[in-house]
Regions:
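N-terminal targeting or signal-anchor segments and their processing/structural boundaries
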Residues: 1-377
């Protein structure tokens, strides 16, 4: 608790320890005692070091949005959600990792982040840029040039940096292809070929899929522009086996490297090996909702995501593997299709996340119907 007096400013949480401190230990409840009458700001900190000062780079913060008046506001029932702020943008560095590959690292929020080469390069020069998932990094692949350095402009919204990258590496990354699935191919799965280098050409005549009766299966190829992966889409049948063969030259990367022969054996299960969950979403917020069916020990595996625009809707999650599931709702206040964190100085709270109160334990060949999830503000 910070007492609000004539010397109080919002930035006090960065510079000065609170007037009163307590902790939650292993519960979500907390108590302050022997408080003086007056106005207060209440914050919650999850710190990397116990200095009772807010360090936005490493700490999480939460705050009560209203001024607390003592002794009037002696009981606070509104939960305080702690969150990690998005840091201001800062370009870190550019570094050559292999011949023909540079990584551009940055911190914080990016908007239209991109790089532009300003060095003179051959007319047949090619480059591909892709963001690395869950890392503040842009990967930049390019056809090698006879030069000891390259110059770039690095753009982010209104920011501009000039960068020179020294080129010393002698070896290009060999093309490595891996499958996203080995063994069981579930009906919700998409079969991907993942590559360490950007794929620039796919020759589907050098790819074959046959079932257990040696009948050729038709498929479609779909390149995922934002990732180094190619989807092979085909109609999966129950209790079936598939042999997928990729012959030499089916995939070509930016360096004109081609693959060797690859074979993948896949099998499907019976429909009865899966289950279904239905969930009636009752939206009483009149806001847009993001509804996630999730799983995993840390509830971090999104199985399916649905978007609901201000109305109620009945959702059916079918062909699910037998295991535990959870359903969560994100109140998408700014309608941008994703969860947004908060900001202490701007006094914006993170978008609300609400979990369906019951863990959904699904068995094979079983329908979990009749679930009602009412979303209130």
């Amino acid at each position: 608790l910070y007492q609000i007096d004539s010397s109080f400013t919002d930035s006090i949480v960065f510079k000065k320890k609170p007037n009163y401190v307590t902790n939650t230990l292993d519960t979500t409840k907390f108590t302050f005692t022997n408080l003086r009458k007056g106005k207060y700001l209440m914050i919650a900190l999850k710190e990397s070091s116990s200095d009772y000062l807010f360090n936005p780079k490493v700490d999480k913060i939460g705050f009560y949005p209203d001024t607390i008046m003592l002794p009037r506001d002696s009981v606070i029932n509104t939960p305080i959600q702690v969150f990690k702020e998005i840091q201001p943008y800062r370009f870190r560095r550019a570094k050559e990792t292999n011949k023909g590959k540079i990584i551009f690292g940055y911190d914080g929020k990016v908007k239209d982040f991109r790089v532009k080469i300003t060095s003179d390069v051959p007319t047949d020069f090619k480059s591909i840029s892709k963001f690395e998932i869950d890392k503040d990094t842009l990967n930049y692949w390019f056809t090698p040039v006879e030069s000891d350095s390259l110059n770039f402009l690095v753009y982010n919204d209104v920011f501009l940096d000039t960068v020179t990258v020294r080129l010393r590496k002698k070896k290009i990354d060999s093309l490595i292809l891996k499958s996203s699935i080995n063994g069981t191919l579930h009906f919700r799965d998409t079969f991907f070929i993942n590559s360490n280098n950007p794929i620039v050409k796919v020759d589907t005549s050098k790819i074959s899929i046959i079932n257990k009766d040696t009948i050729a299966i038709s498929f479609k190829e779909l390149s995922i522009d934002t990732k180094n992966k190619v989807a092979l889409l085909f109609d999966k049948k129950p209790e079936q086996k598939y042999s997928l063969k990729i012959f030499p030259g089916a995939f070509s990367d930016i360096y004109e490297q081609k693959n060797d022969t690859l074979t993948f054996n896949l099998s499907t299960k019976e429909i009865e090996d899966y289950g279904r969950i239905t969930m009636n979403i009752v939206n009483e917020t009149n806001e847009n909702l993001i509804i996630d069916l999730i799983s995993g020990k840390n509830k971090d595996e999104i199985i399916e995501r649905n978007f609901i625009s201000g109305t109620s809707k009945n959702l059916v999650f079918d062909l699910l593997k037998p295991k535990s599931y959870f359903v969560r709702a994100i109140i998408d206040t700014n309608k941008n299709g994703k969860w947004d964190t908060g900001n202490y100085l701007q006094k914006t709270l993170p978008e609300t996340i609400i979990f369906y109160e019951t863990e959904l334990e699904l068995r094979a060949n079983y329908y979990l119907d009749g679930n009602v999830f009412t979303i209130k503000k």
